[in-house]
A protein has these predicted regions:
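Non-catalytic, mobile gating and regulatory segments of ester bond hydrolases
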Residues: 1-30
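Extended, solvent-exposed polar beta/coil surface segments
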Residues: 1-2, 32-35, 195
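Cofactor-binding active-site loop characterized by glycine-rich and histidine/acidic residues
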Residues: 24, 28, 55-239
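N-terminal capping segment at the start of a domain
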Residues: 32-48, 250
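Gly/serine-rich nucleotide phosphate-binding loop at the start of the catalytic core
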Residues: 51
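Glycine-rich ThDP/TPP pyrophosphate-binding loop and its adjacent helix/strand module
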Residues: 176-383
Length: 384
């Protein structure tokens, strides 16, 4: 009699503790909160774009830019982010660009203030390559709108708008573009840029580069179902790019209008497991239970950095995140409001200007840092 077999996969988990040197977790958490608040402010005054995904990406984005290369972060100079030998960052989940816009503004403002206060040119960034807080005004605005918005509203000489005189207001489309600071190339919509990241890693290997530069790409689980992502799985292994390629997956099981596992993929298909999809292709897969926890993120980055360079498997970190994450939330609640808006319901920015939910988010920031936003409690503004 002929024999026909069925096949199932079983995962083998090798958990180990990672010893971390002293690092300033509070500083990273503070930058994450400022970044999250900035991206939500952009959405509030534009009522468009994306909300939950960028928030979920925040700890990944902050850690990659600020923990330094010894802990597995990027080697780069914010003042000259396009230096050819910098590590390469790619926000492959392009619609999550508000988190990078926000962080780059925070970093840009820090250097700007330092330069203004000291006059020391070591703090002077190339403003044509970097972002400043004034660029918030350029979020999802046309070129003409950016050029005239201040003069039409009598704000050209307002003290808060003086940065516009440096090089104008930059347009921020809402998706990662090739001109964006550390983002290496235009990643396009979700599911496309991840293949470009693998190609970048292959390029540096082909020309005989050392372990540097490394290629770091951030993407979500829904986009990893794309055809480009399947090609990435095979080509990165075939090209043996090793630890040069480090993919950071934000796994929150939430897309635009449904869950992936349990929604698009019905729950009875229990062999559909994200981690298995990468281990079965030969990747070196790392996981953490909470990639919105900075200590876990830094530990994973350090573990990837410490991997033997002779191991030529490309690396991916599958970290569970919360779509709609908020650093001021308490047990799934936003103080002063109620249930936190998470999962696919948080995907678009659909809140009215100065809505109750936005005001509640802002109040957690105010309470944490002892500040007060102007006008948030006065309802929607009636002009620009």
């Amino acid at each position: 009699m002929p024999i026909v077999s069925t096949v199932t996969l079983s995962s083998v988990l090798d958990a180990r503790e990672v010893t971390l040197p002293n690092f300033d977790k509070q500083y990273l958490d503070d930058v994450s909160f400022v970044t999250a608040m900035t991206l939500v402010l952009m959405g509030n005054y534009c009522q468009t774009g994306h909300f939950g995904g960028p928030l979920a990406y925040t700890p990944y984005t902050v850690a990659s830019h600020l923990i330094g290369p010894d802990l597995g972060g990027l080697k780069y100079d914010y003042r000259r982010p396009k230096h050819p030998y910098s590590d390469k960052f790619m926000l492959a989940g392009g619609h999550n660009a508000p988190v990078t816009y926000a962080l780059w503004m925070v970093l840009g403002e820090a250097l700007y203030r330092k330069y203004e206060n000291t006059g020391n040119k070591k703090y002077l960034a190339d403003y044509d390559q970097t972002l400043l807080p004034i660029d918030c005004i350029g979020f999802r605005r046309s070129k003409r709108g950016r050029e005239t918005i201040l003069s039409e509203n009598g704000l050209s000489d307002h003290p808060a708008m003086q940065q516009a005189k440096i090089r104008g207001i930059r347009a921020l489309s809402g998706h990662s573009e090739s001109t964006d600071v550390t983002n290496d190339v235009n990643g396009g919509p979700s599911g496309i840029g991840i293949a470009t990241a693998a190609g970048k890693a292959t390029f540096w290997d082909i020309i005989g580069a050392s372990d540097s530069p490394k290629i770091m790409a951030v993407e979500g689980e829904f986009a990893m179902t794309s055809g480009h992502s399947q090609e990435t799985k095979t080509q990165a292994v075939a090209q043996q790019v090793g630890k040069r390629l480090r993919v950071l997956m934000s796994y929150n099981n939430a897309g635009i209008d449904d869950e992936l596992v349990g929604g698009v993929i019905q729950p009875q298909y229990d062999s559909y497991r994200i981690v298995d999809q990468w281990t079965s292709y030969g990747w070196n897969v790392f996981t953490v239970d909470d990639a919105n926890d900075m200590e876990q993120v830094v530990a994973a980055f350090k573990a990837m950095e410490d991997t033997d360079p002779s191991d030529r498997r490309p690396m991916i970190l599958v970290g569970k995140t919360t779509k709609g994450w908020w650093p001021g939330a308490e047990n799934g609640q936003i103080p002063g409001y109620g249930n936190q808006i998470t999962s696919y319901k948080s995907h678009p920015y659909t809140f009215a200007m100065n809505s109750d939910y936005f005001a509640a988010l802002a109040s957690t920031f105010e309470n944490r840092y002892g500040v007060k936003f102007k006008g948030i409690g006065d309802g929607a503004i009636t002009d620009e």
